């Protein structure tokens, strides 16, 4: 069992939470993490890039100069690839799929590895259950960050489904990223300096890995 410090919505220490060791690994698997982040980055590529081939470039239908007796190399079109403004050989075309396949077990191993790294570094905190604000308030979330000594740090706040007011309250906080527990990726965990996980999210994660 791993022990996580839980904070109240005021940013002060509330209690300790014992989290199942099934959420962590003994040794983080760097290759699994690399593959997962690479696949996530690749999936965001639009694949809409396009270049013109020799047959698609406008102009150049006329032979630039006669074949012989000019002292120049022979050429038939200004659309040839070696000409400035000519076509591109084997250039990218639209609708390319950059998606990379990562097995579910590898993705889970990568996620556990990222959680383990944050835990070992002391960069993982918790948020006590039922901590959602009554109404959206950016000021209260700023107080939470300040009281928890998280100023000037990139914070990933992992919340449960019903924490809608906290989500709205952090929209204007530049260094705070708030995501629902099932939206968090390995890249999100590695990019953040500190990860704050709601107590309900820990419960959901534990239920997920136990299946």
Swiss-Prot record:
InterPro entries associated with the record: Ribosomal_uL4, Ribosomal_uL4-like, Ribosomal_uL4_dom_sf
Give the GO molecular function terms: rRNA binding; structural constituent of ribosome
Asked if the keyword Lyase belongs to this entry, the reply reads: no
Q: Quote the SUPFAM superfamilies the UniProt record gives.
A: Ribosomal protein L4
Instruction: Give the protein's biological function.
Output: One of the primary rRNA binding proteins, this protein initially binds near the 5'-end of the 23S rRNA. It is important during the early stages of 50S assembly. It makes multiple contacts with different domains of the 23S rRNA in the assembled 50S subunit and ribosome.
What GO terms in the biological process aspect are recorded for it?
translation
Which region ranges are annotated with the description Disordered? 44-90
Here the segments flagged for biased composition (Basic residues) are 60-72
Q: Pfam families recorded for this chain? A: Ribosomal_L4
Subunit notes for this chain?
A: Part of the 50S ribosomal subunit.
List residues traversing the bilayer: none
Q: Keywords assigned by UniProt?
A: Ribonucleoprotein, Ribosomal protein, RNA-binding, rRNA-binding
Please report the name of this protein according to its UniProt entry: Large ribosomal subunit protein uL4
Where does it sit, as one GO cellular component term?
ribosome
Q: Which organism is it from?
A: Ureaplasma urealyticum serovar 10 (strain ATCC 33699 / Western)
